[in-house]
Amino acid sequence: MQRYPRDMTGHGAEPPAADWPGDARIAVQIVLNYEEGGENNILHGDAASEAFLSEIVGSAAWPGQRHWNMESIYEYGARAGFWRLHRMLACLPVTVYGIATALARGPEQVAAMQDAGWEIASHGLKWIDYKDAPEDVERADMIEAIRLHTEVTGTPPRGWYTGRCSVNTVRLAAETGQFSYVADSYADDLPYWVEIGRHDQLIVPYTLDANDMRFATPQGFNAGAQFLDYLKASFDTLYREGGRMMSIGLHCRLIGRPGRAEALRQFIDYAQAHDGVWFATRSQIADHWAAQHPHQRIARPSQLDRDAFVATYGGVFEHSPWIAAGAHGLELGPAHDTALGLHNALCRVFRSAGDDARLGVLNAHPDLAGKLAAAKRLTPDSTAEQASAGLDALTDAERAAFQAQNAAYLDRFGFPFIIAVRDHDKAGIMAAFAARLQNDRATELAEACRQVERIALHRLRAMLPR
């Protein structure tokens, strides 16, 4: 099987209703990353100094050396920036992404976080890059991070965010069974569920755009006013749409500088001036989402073996299980676990088939109100479809008219008249009969194939979401 693991469909065109508390139009979620004292440093057993997210844009790591200037920039975040932000945000729900070793080196800051009632989620053991870390090393660090976090704060973390993660991170976090949510994703404006083995893991996605890290990156913000404008524009769009979540990422050593902190203060005033704004921690959002939208597992088409797939979807195209068999061999993924997605895969096989094969599918369809219907020998799907348009309750005159049209159509084109009856009533079907009898064969063959595909979509919508 060719299977593509990435989910490119998510909540789709119509996201679920968030139903935020108090009928809020938007949930605003502020994250304060506490990393100072957990960054790369040979004092921490690392091979080199830190080089990421500081005032020294483009800095390089110094192998085997301490970087005095870099260390002092991080120290500013703990010594001054944190307290400026604490004074500003103490009355708001905030989630701290706390590096466990940094928390252990900042007991006064931890006490202040707890006094403010902030959530302290885990940001890992050390603030290092795990993209090349062996899986067993990353797992061991995660376990130690949970242990140390619990030891330092008194309670285990309910949320996890590595940041500089690996392809294994989300799976490893889910496998702990520890977390109400994992935040190592930027894939959506709303929480969503992922299935990892036997674990149903809620993802509360984070942000790298509404994030003060862009003060320390090329093409980022170089003044507080730019950050403020971006936050306000993001807020306005999400507020207008309604039922959305706005995450804001902050770092003590970045937004904690006085020339930037003012932008944050002004944004908070701006957001609070609106009605229907719910400031919340990430754990509050996770609890709300889990209660409002508990996960329900389904038999996902992309995860079925060939026999089960064909048994389930082989009748979507009338009497043509070969189409389902062909679709199973395509590259399928989460995007094909919806009615529209699987429909596309099945139609690809149908459209790519030769003329004789497609004509065979057309001829597998019964006449409308024909002899098979009278003998009750239609498939269950065809029976229900014809009944939906009242074709199972025709008068003698109506039945005679249908049979005459069927005969004329078959004589002209060489295949039965096919129409997605769920889109029509009896009068609409008869009008389509008359109109389509005027087509040339090529035009009508194309239209009949479109109707076959439309029938398949209706059948799939009765079986799958969206």
Model-derived segments and their meaning:
Residues 84, 140, 144, 230-233, ...:
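A non-catalytic, amphipathic alpha-helix used as a structural packing/dimerization or gating element
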Residues 2-202, 227-248, 254-296:
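Catalytic alpha-helical scaffold of carbohydrate-active enzymes acting on polysaccharides/glycoconjugates
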Residues 297-315:
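Charged, compositionally biased N-terminal leader segments and the immediate start
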Residues 204, 217-229, 233, 395:
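A mid-sequence, solvent-exposed acidic-amphipathic segment
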Residues 196-215:
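A structural motif
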Residues 394, 398-466:
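C-terminal non-catalytic interaction appendages of large macromolecular assemblies
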Residues 320-321, 417:
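Residue-level signal for inorganic ion chemistry
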Residues 315, 321-405, 455-464:
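Aromatic-anchored, charged helix-turn/loop surface patch used as a conserved interaction hotspot
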